[in-house]
C-alpha cells in the first residue's frame, strides 16, 4: 500500500538536507548552528528538529494537494458510496462434502464463515465469508480429459463420481456450477469454448456403450445479482459494481453453469457418469488440460466479519470521533462499514440512523422519524492505513450534546486489511463452520488478493462526478472517453488491465428504429474496435466483451434496447451480442 504521509515526509527531509547544505555553503555564518557543512554523524538535535518540521510540512503539503475532499466526499458517499469503500481481500474456495454419506442435495447459505490458519506475528486468524448460497450435490469431478472425435472435433470429457446412496429425485441439477480453476490462458479459453463453441453435449453411463444426447448448454457465471462479491448500497448502480469486480477480481467470472442435466434421469446406485462436451473448433494443442481445471461446489469468499468497536464517550465538543475495532488492536484490522450506532446516557438510550438512508427527521419529508443520525468518513492515517471517523448530527442530538455525556455502542463490519496477503506463504483457508448434516472440508483455490483502496490522487472524485454527470451517449462519444470511464474502476495497478483499456481503438454508435408486432422499437447499435494484441487470447476478448455488454445493458435507457459489436483487429473479426431489452430502470 502506498503511504502518502511517508512519501511527503521523505520529500521534505530530502529538501531540508539538500537545500540546507547549499544554504550553509552560501551563508556559513547564518547556518553554523545547523551543523550541515561537517562530515560524519549529524547532530541528533538537528535531526530531531528536521524530522518534526518535515512531518508538519508534509501533512500541510498533503492537505494542499488533496483537491478538497470535503467538497466531494459527502456527495459521492450519498450517491455512489462504492467509490469510497475498500475492496477487501478476495478468494475462491472449494467446499468438499463427504460424498460417501450424501443422500440428497444440501444448500450452504450465504455468509458461511471460512477462516485461515493463524498467520502473522500475532497468529491472527483471518475471517472470510461466502458471498452467495451454494448447493452441495452428491457429485464430484473425478477426471477431466481433452480427446478428439472421429471427425476431428475436440471433446472435453468430464468424469463425475456419484454417491451410491443418493436419491436423485431429491437432487436438483439445474444450473450445475463449475469453476475453471486454471491459469488465465487455459481458463479463459475453456470459458470461451464451453459457452460459445459448444457443438453437442452427451451423457455416458457406466456399462452402456451408447451415449445419450442432452439438450443442454453452458451459461457464463458471475453476472447475476446474487453473484455480487460485496453488499450493494441502496443508491448504488449495479453496473458500476460489475466493472469494479471485473477489474479487481476476474476469478469471479471463471464460473460456468451447466443447464439441461436436470432433464436426465440418473439410475439409483450409480457410481459415476461421463459428460462429453463436443466443441465446434479444435482445442489449442499448447494449452494443457488436467484433472483439476474444473471444480464443483466453489464459491467466492470475502474478508469481512462482524465485530464491535471500542465504546465512544461523546463530550459534545468534537465534530468527528475516531473509531477503533474492539479487542483487535493488531495493527491490521480495518473498519469496512458501520452497521449500527446506539447511544446511552442518564435519560435512556437512543438509536442513530445512517444519514445516507434519509430515515432521520427531515429526510425525505419525514417529521416523525428518529432525530439522530450518523455519518462516516474515511481518511488516510499517518501509518498509511485508512481510519474511519464518525460524525453525529440531528435535531435532538444538537439539543442534548452539551448538558449530557453519552456513550455510544457500535456494531461494525471489519476486515483483516493486508494481513492475508502479507502472510501469504502460510495463509490457507481450510476451516469453516459445520452448518450441514454432511461433513464439509474447505480449501482455497487461489491466493487471497490484496485489499484495494479507492484512488486518492489525480482528482479522482472530481473525475467521478464528471463521469456520472454525463449521459449514456456521451460515454460512447469516443474511444478516449470510454477508456477514461472504464479506467475509473481499474483500482489495481495491473499491467493486464492497462493493456485491455489501451486496446480500445475506436467507438461508434448508431441509432436503430424498426417496427415489430405493431410497435416502434428504438435502440442503439454500439461498435467497439479492439486491438487483439492487448488481450491474452480470444477467450480474454470474449470475457471483456461479455462484461461490456452486460454493463451497457444495465446503463441503457429503459425505453431503448442496445446491441454490442466488437471488431477485433488486425484480423477484422466481428463478434456480435444479442440485443439487450431493458424492461425496468437500471440498478
Regions found by a protein language model. Name each.
Residues 163-369:
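Short, low-complexity Pro/Thr/Gly
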Residues 89-91, 152-156, 172-174, 197, ...:
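Residues at beta-strand starts and edge strands
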Residues 45, 49, 53, 75, ...:
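Short, Φ-rich (hydrophobic/aromatic) sequence segments
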Residues 1-207, 215, 219-220:
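Extended assembly-interface regions of large multimeric machines
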Residues 57-64, 82, 143-153, 159-173, ...:
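Extracellular ectodomain segments of secreted/surface proteins
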Residues 1-30, 34, 217, 226-266, ...:
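Mixed-charge (acidic/basic) macromolecular-recognition segments
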Residues 29, 345-587:
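C-terminal domain/tail detector
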Residues 1, 7-11, 15, 27, ...:
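Short linear motifs embedded in intrinsically disordered, proline/glycine-rich low-complexity segments
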